[in-house]
Amino acid sequence: MSVQCKEIQYGVYGRCLEMSNKLCRLVVTLDKGPHIICYQLHGEPNVMHEDREDATTQKGPDFDNYFYPGAVWHIYGGHRLWLSPESMPETYYPDNFAVPYTVEGNTITLTPKEQEGNHVQLVFRITLEENGTKATIAHTIYNRDTAPKTFAPWGLSVLAPGGVEIVPQADKPTGLL
């Protein structure tokens, strides 16, 4: 079985894209985000946190003024791309909009619209192994402003209680992280 990609409805998250092979699946939000809201081996629980009750949000005058009136940030859960250093409200972008995507083989590319207020555009490129459980996520941030910006990309994963994430580290003795 090669990698299969199809649109599905996934709980409170609405329209999502499911990528799967014979061993695992991941689900990416399309009505908002993008967030990798589910990663699981077949027959096993999702290792990602899902804020199905919408318990973690941020809003208020700072959000209205910086982003747009009525802006509300939701954690949603799962894996997302964040700007660092963390700053309120700038890094709490309310990513509540539909996400365009393309599928090419075992890779999906998700390109949400430019962030209002921040003037950056995030791009996710997710590749799922055809015969394994490894998902490779490449993040790109484009500065769409006329002025330079100083920030770092932060791939942030919110895991379910007891979840374990393995993150590769540098294998050369540089004396740095």
Regions found by a protein language model. Give the residues of each.
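Surface-exposed acidic/polar loop and edge beta-strand patches at domain peripheries
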Residues: 1-136, 142-177
